[in-house]
Structure formats: C-alpha cells, structure tokens
Design a protein with these regions (language model features):
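Iron-associated oxidoreductase/ferritin-like identity signal
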Residues: 1-154
Length: 154
C-alpha cells in the first residue's frame, strides 16, 4: 500500500468533510420561509454527520502515523440562498467527496481491510446523501433523476 498516497487522500477527505460542516451550517442559517424548520434540521444533520466523517478520517490519518490537515476544502456558494441553489451545491459537494472515497478504495483495495471497509461504508453513506438531495431537487411526481446541470435524464 502506498501509505503517502493514502494519507494524502485521507487528508483531502478530512478537508472536504470539514468544508461540508461549514457549508451545511452556513446554509442552515440562511434558510427562510414556511418550510424552514425541516430543511434546517436536515442541514444540521448533514453538518453533524460531516463532522463525524471528518473525525474518523483524522483518526485514520493518525493511526497510520500521519498528521491531520487543518485546512478546509473549497466552499461552494452562489450567494443566492435559494433552496434549489443550496441543494444543487449540496449535490456537487456530495459528488466530489464520493469521487474521493472511490479513489481511496482504489488505493487500499486488497491491501488493508480496515481502510477498504471504511471507504466502502462512506461510499454508501455519501451515495445515500447524494440520492436524497437528488430526490429533493425533483418536482412532485417527477420520477426521473435530477442532474447537476439542472437537466433531466431522458
């Protein structure tokens, strides 16, 4: 196993998860309107889960003898604070971090069962998040998936 590459990827995951904590917390503060309470609760839950994911990534870094990053990944924001824009940004964030968990899995597959299972578990969790956001972006009775660019899959 290429330990340096694994540590680099785990630190990137840590940074992206921390960006998600900031992102979801910020947007929970910016939601207005009659649907505010359930949306804010969902955003708070996403922030809390992101923090748990970040902590676990940091633990793995230190277990492997590395130093956890203090950096925070890129923060996406349209500054419109429209629920649709917030959800599209969430979808982009989930897709980005999901890609990194797959890259981690490729780095450790067949070499470290603990890291392999960690990557698989987080792939499942992030896929569930991505699918939940996708459904939230659909219009009532819309069965087709929403795509990041705002186009429907035909």
């Amino acid at each position: 196993m290429n330990k340096d590459a694994v540590l680099k990827m785990l630190n990137r995951i840590l940074e992206l998860e921390m960006a998600g904590v900031v992102y979801y917390t910020h947007y929970a503060l910016m939601v207005y309107g009659h649907n505010r309470i359930p949306i804010v609760d969902w955003l708070h839950n996403q922030a809390n889960e992101g923090l748990a994911h970040a902590r676990l990534a940091g633990e793995l870094v230190t277990w492997l003898g590395g130093h956890p990053s203090l950096a925070i990944g890129p923060l996406l924001e349209t500054h419109t604070h429209d629920i649709g824009d917030i959800l599209r940004e969430s979808l982009a964030h989930e897709a980005e971090i999901l890609k990194d968990y797959y890259e981690l899995l490729d780095l450790v597959k067949g070499q470290d069962v603990r890291l392999e299972e960690y990557a698989r578990d987080l792939i499942v969790a992030e896929t569930v998040h991505k699918d939940a956001v996708n459904k939230m972006l659909r219009k009532p009775n819309q069965l087709e998936s929403f795509v990041t660019e705002g186009q429907m899959i035909k």
